[in-house]
Structures are given as structure tokens and as C-alpha cells.
Amino acid sequence: MEEVTVVAVGYGDVRRRDLTGSIGSANMGDLTKTPVSNITESLGGRIAGVQVSSGDGGPGDNFNIVIRGAGSLTGSTAPLYVIDGFPSESSGLGSINPNDIESIDILKDASATAIYGARGANGVVIVTTKKGGAGKPTITYNGSVKVGLVKNTPEVMNAYDFVMLQQEIMGSGEEFQKNYITELYPTLDAYHNAQSYDWQDYIYRTALSHNHHISMTGSQGDLKYTTSLSYDDTQGVIINSGVKRYQGRVNLSQKVNNKLKIDFTGNYASTVQDGPTVSGATSSMSTAYMYSVWSFRPVSPTGSDLLNQMYDEGVNMSEDYRFNPVKSAQNEYRHKTTNNLQFNIGAEYEIIKKLKLKVTAGYTSTDYKNEEFNGSQTRTGNSHPSNTQSKGINAYLYQSEARSYLNENTLSYQLNKNSHNFNAMLGMSVQKNTSYIHSIRTEKISNESFGMAGLDKGSTPAVNSSKGENKLMSYFGRINYNYDSRYYITATMRADGSSKFARGNRWGYFPSGSLAWAFARESFIAENASWLSNGKLRFSYGQTGNNRIGNYDYMAHLITDDDLYKYPWNGQFVPGYVLSSMQNEKLKWETTEQLDLGLDLGFLDGRINLNMDYYIKTTKDLLLDADISASSGFSSATLNVGKLRNSGLEITLETTNIKTKDFSWNSSFNIAFNKNEIIALNSGQPYMTSYISWDNKYKTTPAYISKVGESAGKMYGFIYDGTYKYEDFNKTIDENGKEVYTLKEGIPYYVAGTQPGDPKYRDLTGEGEINDKDKTTIGNGQPKHIGGFTNNLVWKNFDLNIFFQWSYGNDILNANRMVFENPAAKQNTNMFAAYTNRWTPENPTSNIPRARAQGSNEYSSLYVEDGSFLKLKNISLGYNFEAKTLKPLHISSARVYLSAENIATISGYSGSDPEVSTRNSPLTPGFDWSPYPRAFSMSLGLNVTF
């Protein structure tokens, strides 16, 4: 198979048997067995060393790819995407129908990625779409209908448990009696028969989705063509949420004569996304959508229908404005539109035999529009006097336009003589990127019926705009040589000049080299080890770069604000300008040095294939948002400081287990180990802390710490040692006959007046008092290893595909439990049902803090959980109709299939899904707060070719 398999290596293709670098290829047959709108969703666990994550399970293009560990701390860790030869720093895979993709190749080591120089440090994803073939037109239809639902939701308290909790918080006196003892429910026990509202039942739905793709491919004379149209309608499992995409693609290849060939590729996609923003950076937890879903009380003491209530009047709305989540989903208008256009045109001319000149030009445009409208039936549009978040009827419009222009010119030469095989390529590239952003926000719109058209009908409009541009000029070359397909050498060099840096630092040079020895082709091995069908040793070393910073970060920035920066002059205020950032003309790209040692083995005529790679990837001159001396006038600046190292082992095993006339069974297994270590930070800086913006109580409390000598982004807080028990106290009786508990001497405390049931944190310093000095590492969001396991079974006309995915050794900071298993003294807020096992005088051995607990609003190991999981990700069962059945219908092939996704998960994580990270970054991995749930889905599909 390796004899004919071709792999994209950037500016060319190479037979897999001749590879000297580390390149992983996706099995497109496996990836398209389950219908998805974005192929990235199916990549996780398929290729060793490639980690695919999403913040949550919401519909849309929210996927992140990290190759061989995060190569930056505060910079981007995303790979470079090259789609049909057009390089882009942002993924365009959401605009391509998976059925249009021919291959996906992942360049991992420096030998492979150095050809992309300053943008190759995080790896390269090369996507090649399907091209036209010779022969008469062939029409193919792919369609499916999908049903999705939420299988695993957290259980919340019922009416009785909720009211019992309120009694503990309020006491049994007048406040509780006034709020919860009513004519309808005269006693606490009466709530056993009360109607309990689980708001999840009202905001989740069974989502019905469908997608359709039709393509035509063939040739007419010397013109080869393929064209396709697709429509995808994906409903979200939260009401009023979903994504629709309209997409079209055309690929043309015209052979003008024996020397000249012209290619054209064009793709257009329009994507529309609706639905609430479930999780995002915010200063108040009450603005998170799932907060209202889980916290809204489950019972009405008066028997009124809570579904008709706009807000919960039982809470202090100046601190916790809890809005009806059903009305939020129904009435908040959230409409995002993305229009993406990409086309490439290229001409290849053979100057003399084996010497070819290729000239390409490309253009990409991305227009994005975000519309938000909040009427009177929404959180911020409602004018309740206690609603401190009210802006009246309000609207927001954000629009961005991004353009990219590309010209690339390559000259390639190939020579094969006797046992010598030589290939050389030289090239130059020019790319220009422009962006224009503008937004307007207005409040107190006079007439709600105007909708988004009322932007000019409000008061206090806030208008923002920005414009940017960057350019990249590059020269590059590569030489491949092998002798007798046994001894290989590859050398690559790229020089990049970027406008993102000052003139003295604009050019960077990125060399790489690799060697390989195909020892199984040596006669002394081939003659004595016939069972060894392939054996190759690979070694590579090289440098790549990362230039993912702003267009003008090396410059000092001036800003102005009429309200903040002004001074009196001649009796009136004149706007003032201030520096918002520090100039740094020494700024340059991050440089990543990578060493890779690989071994490829094949046994029994290719029935068993094993690939292993060990790598050490060191990034220096990190583009770090570093703390600087206050005497500079700034608190931080973007500097080239620090060093980060990733090292690991990747193993891929592919086997043909059984192969007979009627039955075959193939397996593919991959596992990747990665160790991340910070070698250095800013001069004299032993660590850096990171904060999560999700609530005011925690915005000044570090949640993560990154220490020199350890991996980045470890969870930070107190070690939780359970709750204080009665035996920790001396008990006395006061003059009123009330029991008084005083901590015994020598038992450390965090809050004065600690009582039984309060959280107990470990005194690491031994000072006898718990304080910030006792905080330490309490978890690690980075997995020890990740992987996947695929099985393909074929029996006669039936095919079965089963795919497992896993992650092991990573922790999750479950912020949902920090709120919903920790009410402290907060009234009228529902909790997870797990909180019924809290500490109470009747349950004094519980390690869950009591109601009204003191000192509980802290990051601690109580809320850090093992996020390891083994997931049965996909199953697909298909039937291929026999040709004799289809021939009378003029159909050449047809397959009907049933598939399921996110079927079952083995995990110790208490949340709805361990595959979550709502604040995903190298410094804050594994944070779970108010996620959009990941749906279980079943699809019925049809593939037909005419």
C-alpha cells in the first residue's frame, strides 16, 4: 500500500514509502462514516499526537487542534491550515463539506513543517479537496437525517429538598415562614407532593438535523472537473439554537497542451448560527445561561406557574439577577452570519523535461456579522427596578471583513537515474492580509418592534472600529534525495519577512534536515527476514517559527476616550491621548527547535504496520504577555522571554486481523504521550498565575499557576481535607442554653469563628492558620496520554465501523460544583441533588460543606476531578447494495447506513461530559463552567452514485 499512497508535504507530494519526516494522515473513509458538518469534529483520536478539543458541545466551528502539545503560553497554539495550497492561520474547515475532502495530512516534525517557516511551529494541517477524474460524468448524493438529545444531565434538587435547604439557610423563623409556609404548603412535608420544575426539561429538546450533498465529477476532453452543492441544517439541543450552512465548490483542471496545465478551485459557504451564548468571559456568574437553568428555584410556594415568571423575585436582583432561562432562549435574538469565499488559480508549465514552473494566485474573504437584540422579555432588556443589568431595549451589531491575497511561484526539478532519485524545489511567496472591524451598541431603543433596525433609535450609542494589515514575503527551497530507495536525505530552508515586526527583526530563517534508512530493503535483511515487509529509521532536526501576534504589537499604541482622557483648554474640554502599550522594536517570532527520531515497521506483507516517533520540541523567545516593572508606566508588555519544552512518544499500530472472501477485520490503534515543561519565564520570574473571568468573587483569585520546571496551567488552590467535625471542637453551653463550638487548640483554621461543617483546608506551612501561603498545585489539565482505537469489519455487503477515543491523566476544575454544591448563605438558589448529602447535624460525617458554610468560596481540590475518559465515540453500520440490484435503476453504487455518535463514556467525572474545557488555553486547561451539553445522536444516511 505504501508503494502507491501519496502524502501531501507542502508544495508537493511524496510517496509514503519515501517519507523522512513525521506526517500523519487521516483515513477519510473512517471520518465520513458518521455525518458531521465540520470534519474537525471527527479528527480527535484519529492521528497520534493530534489533540482536538472544543469548549463544549455547542453547534458551530468551535474546535481547537493542538499538535504535539502547546508550543506557546500566551500566544496561539493553533496549527497552520493549508487548504488546496492556500495557507491560513485560522481554520477554514467549517466552510468545507467533509464529502468534498480527498485527504487530510498533518505535518508534525520540523523536517515536514519547516517549509512553512515562521508559521509552522504549531504543526501544519494540509487539506486537499477532491479533483475531477477522467471519464463520463458521475453524480453522487450523500444525505442523512440526524436525531440528537442530551443523555447525561446533572440532577438538581426537587421541591422538598430545595425547601429543606432554604430552611437551613434562613432558619425556621419568620423569614422562612413568610417565604415557604403558605396556604398551599402549610408544612415542609407538604412539599413532598409539590410540582418540581427541572428547568433542563424545558430548555433541552430532541434536535432534528439533516444534511445533503450532491456532486458531479468527470471530464470533457482535456478538462477535468468536479463541482458540488451542499446544505446542512444542524439543530442544537437547546431550544432556538442551531447552525445552517449553504455551500458550493468547483475544481477545474485544464490541460492546454503537453506542457501547460491550468487549475482552478473555488469554494463559497454561508453559515448562519442562532442561539444563546451559553458560556463566556463574564464578571457575574448569573449572566451564564446554564446558571439560570440550574439555579432557578424548582417550586412556587403559591402554586403559580414558574414558566410564566420573568425573573425570580425571591433573590436579591442587585447581586443575582436570575432570569427565566426559557424566556431567554425564546426571546434573545442571537444571529451570527459568516460568509467565506476562497479561490485559487494556478498554472503549471514544463519548461524542459522534468523542470516545472508553477504560478498560483489565491484569494480568501471572510465576512462575519453578529447581531444581538434584547427586547423587554430578556435579561438586559427588561426594565424591572431591581434589574441593575437593564439597558432598556438594546441592540448590538458587530461586523468584520477579512481579506487575504496570495501569490506563490515554485520551480521544481526531478531526476531519476539508475538508483539515484533527486527532487528539488525553489519558491517564493507573497501574502497580504487585511481586516476591518466595526461595531455599534445602543440602549434604550424607543420602539421594540424595530428590532435590529432600531440601532439608530436608541440613546448613548457606542461605536468602535479598527483596521489592520500585515504582509509576509518568503523564499523557500527543499531537496529530496534517495539512493535505491534505501538511503534518504531531505534538506529544507525558508526565509520569512513579516511586517508584524520592526525592520531590524523582520526576517527569520528556518532550516531543517532529515535522514532515513530503509533497512528492510537491504538484501541481507530481505533475504533472511521475509516476514519483515517494511523497516525504516528516520531522524530529523529543524527550526520553525510562530508569528501569531497582532499586526502592530511592536509599536506603542495611543488611545483616547472623551469621558476618561480629557483636559480643559480655553474653557472647554479637549480629548487627550495616552499610551496604552509599550513600544518594543526588539520583538521577534518564537522559534521552535524540534528533534524527531522515528521507526516504521511492517510485518507479514503489510498486515501489521507499526510507526513510532519520539520527539523533543523546544520553543524559545516565547511571545509572552509578561509582567514588567511599574516604573515603565505599564503593568505588562509583549516580550520575547521564556522557554517551553514538549517531549513525547507517538505510536500507531495498524493491523489486518482477518481477511477472507466474505469477511475482513482491520484495526487501527494510536496513543500519544506528551510531557510539557516550562524551562524559563521572564527574568527572575519563578511562576505566573492565571485568572478566570466568570464571577466577581473569583476574578482576583488565581485559579491556575505555571511554574518553571513544571507543566503549564496547573490548577491552584487549597488542598481540601474534608469538613470540620464535632471532635475538632470544644463544646460549651452559653447562658441561653445554646451550644457553642470553639476549635481545639492546635487545629488550623481559615476563617475566624469556624463551625462544624465548614470546609477544612490543609495547613501546608504549619503556621496554625490557613492563608494564601498554603495554596499549592491541586490538579493538572494536561493529559498524560491520548489516543483512539478503530475497528472496521466487513461481512459480505455489510460494513461496521467502531471508534473509541480516550484521554488519561488530565484533571477538570468543575466550577459548576463550586456554585451548585456550595450555596454558603445564598438564598433561593437551587443546587445539584448531590448536595443533599451535605454536612448537617444529622449527617455529621459528610465531607460536603454545610449550608451557610464559611470560607467555602475558594478554589480547592474538592472541585478538582479526574477528567480521564474512555468514550465509545462512533458506531456506523452500513449495507452496500449489489450491482445487479442497482443496474436496472441506472445506479452504479448505493449504501444505506445507521450511525451513532457520543454513545457511551466511562469516566469518574461527575459533570455531564469530561470532554470539556470552556476556557481552553495552555494556561487554563480543563475549566468547566456553564457548558453547552454534548449530544448523543443517531443518523440514518444514504450514499448513491449514478
Regions found by a protein language model. Give the residues of each.
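Extracellular/periplasmic, surface-exposed regions of secreted and cell-surface proteins
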Residues: 3, 31-36, 77-78, 210, ...
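Surface-exposed, extracytoplasmic segments of Gram-negative outer-membrane nutrient-acquisition systems
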Residues: 186-190, 376-383, 389, 565-578, ...
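Short, small/polar-rich motifs associated with maturation and membrane association
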Residues: 1-249, 254-269, 278, 317, ...
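Residues within well-ordered beta-strands of beta-sheet-rich folds
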Residues: 126-128, 598, 652, 790-794, ...
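A surface-exposed, glycine/aromatic-enriched loop/edge motif typical of exported proteins
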Residues: 153-181, 269-316, 372-374, 439-441, ...
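Short aromatic-centered micro-motifs
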Residues: 81, 481, 742, 793
